Swiss-Prot record:
Domain of life: Bacteria
Gene behind the chain: licB
Induction of expression: Induced by lichenan, lichenan hydrolysate and cellobiose. Subject to carbon catabolite repression.
Residue positions of the active site: C7 (phosphocysteine intermediate)
Sites bearing Phosphoserine, chain numbering: S37
Task performed by this protein: The phosphoenolpyruvate-dependent sugar phosphotransferase system (sugar PTS), a major carbohydrate active -transport system, catalyzes the phosphorylation of incoming sugar substrates concomitantly with their translocation across the cell membrane. This system is involved in lichenan transport.
Organismal lineage: Bacteria, Bacillati, Bacillota, Bacilli, Bacillales
Entry keywords, A to Z: Cytoplasm, Kinase, Phosphoprotein, Phosphotransferase system, Sugar transport, Transferase, Transport
Keyword Kinase: yes
Main subcellular localisation: cytoplasm
Molecular function terms, GO-annotated: kinase activity; protein-N(PI)-phosphohistidine-sugar phosphotransferase activity; protein-phosphocysteine-sugar phosphotransferase activity
Name of the protein in its database record: Lichenan-specific phosphotransferase enzyme IIB component
Organism: Bacillus subtilis (strain 168)
Compartments it resides in: Cytoplasm
Length: 102
């Protein structure tokens, strides 16, 4: 599964990406997880199975949902508490539910 995260500058989610990768690894799952800034999404969405937005870029949801629909990629906003506490396991679970992967 390829999980693309979007944040304001592509940097604020780097710790969350690390925590998600660790959680996936502990579960024996071979996922690719990366973060980009909002203006870079179009260059990466073709490689993604799901697209998750950081709460700080929630305002981009309508625009990115349209893009996701045109590419067959489900889009949602990361739970604010899970994002704020850097809960990689819960964000990973959300991505799997969004992408219908167990």
């Amino acid at each position: 599964m390829n999980i693309l995260l979007v944040c304001a500058a592509g940097m604020s989610t780097s710790l969350l990406v690390s925590k998600m990768e660790k959680s996936a690894q502990e579960q024996g799952k071979d996922y690719t997880i990366w973060a980009v800034s909002g203006d870079s999404v179009q260059n990466h969405i073709d490689k993604a199975d799901v697209l998750l937005l950081g709460p700080q870029v929630r305002y981009m949801l309508p625009q990115l949902k349209k893009l996701g629909e045109s590419k067959g990629v489900p889009v949602d906003v990361i739970n604010t508490v899970h994002y704020g506490t850097c809960n990689g396991a819960e964000v990973l679970k959300s991505a799997e539910q969004l992408g219908h992967v167990s």
